[in-house]
Amino acid sequence: MIREAKQEELQEVLNLYLYLHEENVPEQSEHLSVIWSQIIADKNHHLIVNIVDGKIVSSCVCVIIPNLTRNIRPYAFVENVVTHADYRGHGYATECLNYAKTIAVNNNCYKMMLLTGSKEQKTLEFYKNAG
């Protein structure tokens, strides 16, 4: 099941990010709580999760950026694409990206950009195949 993350899923999202590039989960703090609440409340910030057997196994972030050009049409950035190592190769991240594309289309975005800092060939091939 694909949907946007809920307020109570912060810890599960942070644990998933250990499979992205994080070395540890941030300590609970006021700053962390404020940032998480901002993300959840922001209508242009979409933290997409893919749930399998009640567990968040894949995720990505899609942010809609208001814009004054292109006939005042926004654009979308996609970042932080990650899948739990035990669930890779089953299309879960692709499903998250497709959900992000639907959000971008529904918001009349004129383009959608996938951002990555990865140099790994397997990751780059995945993004290339995702379009």
Residue positions per predicted region:
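Conserved GNAT acetyl-CoA-binding A-motif
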Residues: 97, 104-116
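A short beta-loop-alpha structural element at the N-terminal edge
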Residues: 1-13, 26
